[in-house]
From Swiss-Prot:
GO annotations of cellular component type: nuclear speck; nucleolus; nucleoplasm; nucleus
Pfam families: NRDE-2
Per-repeat ranges for HAT: 314-346, 404-436, 766-800, 986-1018, 1075-1109
Principal place of residence: nucleus
Protein name listed in UniProt: Nuclear exosome regulator NRDE2
CDD domains: NRDE2_MID
Gene (name only): Nrde2
Alphabetical keyword list: Acetylation, Cell cycle, Cell division, Coiled coil, DNA damage, Mitosis, mRNA processing, mRNA splicing, Nucleus, Repeat
Length: 1172
């Protein structure tokens, strides 16, 4: 069938090409719409004749009428032109649409039908030839290029091969190359004809020996295998967080008759279903029956909550409304706003009450960004109501740190500090933030920032900054910031600046001239600069007199002639720094660097007696200028803070002074693993010598992680420096402070004796001799003759050296000097307690002769008569009198401590020592249960008074003292239980329970944690330990629970590995690893995610060491660079990385140099030393 039926017979009648050319009206631009009427009439006639069965007549068209119609406008077109333009446009659109549809249908018929009749095909070819002739007549210039024209039009319609005259023009040569053929080495897959194979066989191959694998998609339908989701996927984690549906039982009224058995109801006893015409089988429930009847549920049923989730949502909505009401009524309550912010976590964890539909709950619950935005919106509302609240602004900055850029966050910090320059907590947070930004960090920048902070706060404290008043606790906070700066410089390797800061602060605090005391701090610092640059000996140096003496000398005029001491020998220099040049280069660098850190921690100054100048210094970094320390000098007016300054200085020098940094910078300063050492405590649990370093190293110490921390002292020059500090500072103190400082000096020497006992026994004799000489010299001073603390340490020293009889003589002499003070003297109780404990630990048998000596000591303590040496067993009467005296003294102390709100200091001082002596006395005379009863009685009495949870600001001092007393008593309790377990058979459960209760109250006590980890390591039940650690870490703000939880898991892993090895070789265990490695890694990640753990160098060192021990080098590198993002100032991290990754030595040194950390041995100097 032709495309246009009106010209079907025309194509058959006319064979001439001229008619076909002129009748090609599809391409004739002169065709008009008026021809449509005549064409449609001819089509109707042809259709009518075809339906009657007669052959269609042949029409003969005359060319001239068609030409005239085509050359001029027809009457029909003129009539149509006079109609409205709107109808004309509509007809054109309709005609084009019909033409498009017919053309599309024609192409489909041509492409799909291959069995059309020859007659129809001839008609189609004739009509196409007529149209082609008409195009040739209209374009005579083209002539013989008809085939080219047809080929050009091939992009618009189909072309029959018979219509083309010259077959050579069918194909066209494209001379433009296709770069894709060269690039992909094959044709584009869209240009390759596709076909479908039927079957996978191939002719000509042997099916038994050969096979062809056809590429392409298989005809079989692929079934997607859905893997089961595990518990840690997002969907399942969300399900785990949802609240479980409460299951409520239906309790039946209890019968009075005794029940002999509990009957089990049978399902057959259930009520038989009721049948009806609607429910003939009785299988429909009530809801289905109502639906079949066209009814709905009852009104009361529809109003009831359909699930537990609805009730929870209703309760949660009520809490939200309550919070909104309360903050609307009390917009100035900042704590209420903070509680509202914390409440958003609970709202987002709940099954989203604000969800828009199903599935939205999980998205809302898991969307961290949505949670942060909600919290931020609440905080912004709170700040609008309280524009002066620093706490709310700090909370906002901490929240914005999750999704703000560091640069934007730093600008907000600076704006906040500009508005509140007198807020010390704000300064502390800002310094910690800047200290942990690796991109912008450098030692000099942060050092100047510390100086700016301290100088600004000094101006506020002096009143120079009139716009902002002084806040309470400013001086204590300034001292804490000063210590934080010193620890920062020590960890960065700049030990010389740390020592110079303490030297300047001691002179600025204790040797200040009277003429400048009333001046502002800034002016005092200006007067101090000439003294610092004068070359006068400073604190710790020989001949130091202080700032005041130098000022008097300047006012009198003249000069002081310094003569060299001829008795002193020259300082012994190291023979050579590199002892073995065959070692790898990184090992040599680490050894030399650590050696220089140990020897060169004091600032270098030119020796005028040797005519030295500043140019003689080989390392300019060892010289400290006044510009490096001037801004950090602060004024301390409190005597307690002045004494803490000396204690902190001695602690930096390695002296066990008992000083701990403030809580704000404690974990920033923690960088060594001495908190896990428990060897001495295991040997002697009662008389354990605790140096109380708390994981903080001293100056000049850059040791490897895991090496035991011994107080072995410094070299000769360093020891002389420490002695000079004591000699200069001791005359400045008096009373209890001087006694405590003398005790610290003696404990420092005893610690070196203990080091010699365990490592170098060759030096034990000389070290013991010098230590006894110091003790005797201190006791010879008039104010120390009755100092029982010094007598106690001297006797303990003799006992450690093995001189038991001499130690007993010292103890007896000290106790005979006490007189009749009885149980009211704390120092006397401590002396007697140590004496009795040493006697108990001397004999392995608790019922031996030494036990009688211990009972004698504790009994004579209660008597009013002077003390007498041990002569024999104590009588039962004396024991009963002593017990009665202890009871009365304990009741008296407890009554005084609990009666008044601020407990008296005298009662608190003697209470702890008295309870410990009484517990030991009861243990020796009755047993361990009696001692435990004393502990329980005291603990129950003082627990409510101590307010362990949250002491108020007005009674924080008294509560802290009571807490310290309880902590000391708890430690005595655990030590006594451990000692009893060593000498007798005793269950482990009481000790475990005691430690658990104590650690919940004192989560920062490292001694208790060490004992807990050790006893739990002997147990095979790890679940209780893990649950306990999880409970403490969730509630406590300290970092010690995390550290000891990791240590406990590492000990367990070490135990499992030791069992799986025989003779040093690994045994293929049949049991799995139990996931200890993943558990330890998860503990590390959770600890680092906390606020205090993120900036703790010790935690990062432990994490890096653990991953290296597993052999995963790439992951260890990632953790190292992650640690640098949080602690870029810690030099020990870089040195650990050099030991773990020797190939990265140059890169790590470049980073250290870029961040301005102290590098004492550049690689260039190392090469020169190796060449020599």
């Amino acid at each position: 069938m032709a495309l246009f039926p009106a010209f079907a017979d025309v194509s058959e009648a006319s064979g001439d090409g001229a008619f076909r050319k002129e009748l090609d009206w599809l391409s004739n631009p002169s065709f008009r719409v008026g021809n449509l009427t005549s064409l449609s009439r001819q089509t109707e006639e042809v259709t009518a004749l075809a339906s009657e069965g007669s052959p269609p007549p042949r029409y003969s068209f005359i060319r001239s009428p068609l030409k005239s119609e085509l050359s001029g406008e027809s009457n029909t077109s003129e009539k149509l032109a006079q109609t409205s333009r709107k109808k004309k446009k509509e007809k054109k659109k309709r005609r084009k649409h019909q033409h498009h549809r017919k053309t599309k249908r024609r192409h489909e018929q041509l492409s799909s039908s291959g069995s059309e009749s020859d007659t129809e095909a001839g008609k189609d070819r004739a009509s196409r030839s007529i149209r082609d002739d008409q195009k040739e007549a209209e374009k005579p210039c083209q002539g013989s290029n008809a085939a080219a024209a047809v080929a050009a039009a091939a992009g618009h319609r189909s072309i029959w091969l018979e219509d083309i005259h010259d077959l050579t023009d069918v194909f066209r040569t494209d001379k433009k190359p296709d770069p894709a053929n060269w690039e992909y080495k094959s044709l584009y897959r869209g240009d390759i004809a596709r076909y479908k194979r039927k079957g996978d066989s191939c002719l000509g191959i042997n099916p038994k020996k050969q096979c062809i694998s056809w590429e392409g998609a298989s005809a079989a339908k692929k079934h997607s295998h859905r893997h089961l989701e595990r518990y840690f996927t997002k969907k399942n984690v969300g399900l785990m967080r949802t609240e479980g549906i409460a299951v409520c039982s239906n309790p039946e009224p209890a019968s009075s008759e005794p029940v002999t058995f509990i009957p089990v109801k049978d399902s057959a006893e259930a009520a038989t279903p009721v049948t009806s015409w609607l429910n003939p089988l009785g299988i429909y429930d009530q809801s289905t029956t109502q639906w079949l009847q066209g009814q709905g549920p009852a009104e009361q049923e529809s109003k009831q909550p359909d699930s537990q989730q609805d009730r929870e949502n209703a309760a949660l909505k009520a809490r939200v409304e309550e919070f909104n009401r309360r903050v609307r009524e009390n917009p100035w309550d900042t704590q209420l706003w903070m509680a509202f912010v914390a409440f958003q976590d609970e709202v987002m964890r709940s099954p989203g009450i604000y969800a828009l539909g199903e599935g939205e709950q999980e998205k809302h619950r898991k969307s961290l960004k949505l949670l942060l935005e909600k919290k931020l919106a609440v905080l912004e509302r709170a700040i609008e109501s309280n524009p002066g609240s620093v706490e709310l602004k700090l909370a906002k900055l901490q929240l914005c740190s999750e999704f703000w850029e560091p640069s934007a966050l730093a600008k907000e910090w600076q704006k906040l500090l500009f508005l509140h320059p007198n807020n010390t907590s704000l300064w502390q947070r800002y310094l910690s933030f800047c200290q942990s930004q690796f991109g912008t960090f450098s030692v000099s920048k942060l050092h100047s920032l510390y100086g700016k902070c301290l100088s600004t706060l000094s101006a506020v404290k002096d009143g120079s900054m009139l716009s902002h008043p002084v806040l309470p606790g400013t001086e204590e906070a300034m001292f804490g910031l000063f210590l934080q700066q010193c620890h920062f410089l020590r960890q960065a390797g700049h030990s010389e600046k740390v020592i110079s800061l303490f030297q300047a602060m001691v002179d600025f605090t204790f040797f200040k001239p009277d003429s400048v005391k009333e001046l502002p701090t800034k002016v005092q610092v200006e007067f101090f600069e000439p003294f610092w640059d004068s070359g006068e000996p400073r604190v710790g140096e020989k001949g130091a007199r202080g700032w005041r003496a130098w000022m008097h000398q300047q006012e009198r005029g003249g000069w002081v002639l310094i003569t060299p001491d001829e008795d002193d020998e020259e300082p012994e220099e190291e023979d050579q720094e590199i002892k073995d040049k065959t070692l790898p280069r990184w090992q040599i660098w680490l050894a030399v660097e650590r050696s220089r850190d140990q020897r060169h921690w004091r600032p270098w100054r030119p020796d005028k007696t040797k005519k030295q100048t500043e140019e003689d210094c080989e390392d300019p970094e060892r010289q400290v200028l006044f510009d490096d320390i001037g801004q950090s000098l602060i004024r301390l007016s409190s005597p307690d803070l002045q004494f803490q300054l000396i204690q902190a200085f001695l602690q930096f020098l390695g002296v066990p002074s008992g000083f701990l940094p403030p809580a704000s910078c404690l974990y920033l300063a923690m960088d060594e693993s001495s908190i896990f050492e428990s060897e001495l405590y295991d040997e002697k649990p009662l008389t354990y010598f605790n140096p109380s370093f708390s994981g903080i190293s001293c100056v000049g110490s850059m040791e490897q992680l895991g090496r035991p921390r011994w107080t072995k002292g410094h070299n000769r020059e360093g020891e002389e420096f420490v002695r000079n500090v004591f000699h200069l500072v001791l005359p400045l103190l008096a009373g209890k402070q001087k006694s405590q400082l003398s005790l610290s000096w003696l404990r420092y020497e005893i610690a070196k004796v203990i080091w010699c006992l365990h490592t170098k026994k060759k030096r034990l004799k000389s070290q013991g001799k010098s230590c006894k000489k110091l003790a005797k010299n201190l006791l010879k001073e008039p104010e120390n003759r009755n100092n029982f603390c010094l007598w106690k340490q001297y006797a303990h020293l003799e006992w450690l050296l093995g001189n038991t009889e001499d130690a007993r003589k010292v103890f007896d002499t000290a106790l005979s000097m006490a007189g009749s003070s009885e149980l009211k003297d704390r120092e006397l109780c401590e002396l007697s307690l140590l004496y009795a404990e040493l006697e108990m630990e001397l004999s392995p048998d608790s019922r031996g002769a030494t036990t009688g000596r211990a009972v004698h000591i504790l009994t004579r303590l209660t008597e009013s008569s002077p003390y007498g040496p041990y002569t024999g067993q104590v009588s039962s009467t004396q024991v009963l009198k002593a017990r009665k005296a202890y009871e009365l003294a304990l009741q008296d102390c407890l009554g005084q401590s609990c009666a008044s709100s601020p407990a008296p200091a005298e009662a608190l001082d003697c209470l702890g020592s008295l309870v410990r002596c009484f517990m030991l006395f009861q243990y020796l005379t009755v047993g361990i249960d009696a001692a435990v009863q004393i502990y329980g009685r005291v603990f129950a009495k003082l627990k409510g008074s101590a307010r362990l949870e949250d002491p108020g600001p007005e009674d924080s001092t008294s509560s802290q003292s009571l807490t310290n007393v309880l902590e000391a008593v708890s430690m005595m309790h655990t030590s006594l239980l451990r000692f009893h377990m060593n000498v007798c058979v005793y269950p482990l459960a009481p000790l475990r329970e005691t430690l658990s209760d104590a650690l919940k109250l004192y989560p920062g006590n490292q001694v208790l944690w060490r004992a807990y980890v050790q006893i739990q390591n002997k147990s095979h039940s790890a679940n209780k330990t893990r649950r306990f650690f999880d409970t403490v870490t969730r509630s406590a703000k300290h970092l010690e629970p995390w550290l000891f939880a990791i240590e406990a898991e590492k000990l367990r892993k070490k135990l499992v590995e030791s069992v799986q090895r025989v003779g040093g070789r690994e045994v293929h265990a049949t049991i799995p690893e139990t996931g200890l490695t993943h558990r330890i890694r998860a503990l590390f990640e959770n600890a680092i995610r906390s606020d205090k753990g993120n900036q703790c160098p010790l935690l990062w060192r432990m994490y890096l060491n653990f991953l290296v021990s597993l052999g995963n080098k790439e992951r260890s590198k990632g953790v190292f660079y992650k640690a640098l993002q949080s602690c870029p100032w810690a030099k020990v991290l870089y040195m650990d990385a050099m030991e773990y990754f020797p190939d990265e030595l140059q890169e790590i040194l470049d980073v250290m140099t870029e961040k301005e950390l102290r590098v004492r041995l550049p690689l260039e100097e190392l090469e020169l030393l190796l060449e020599d």
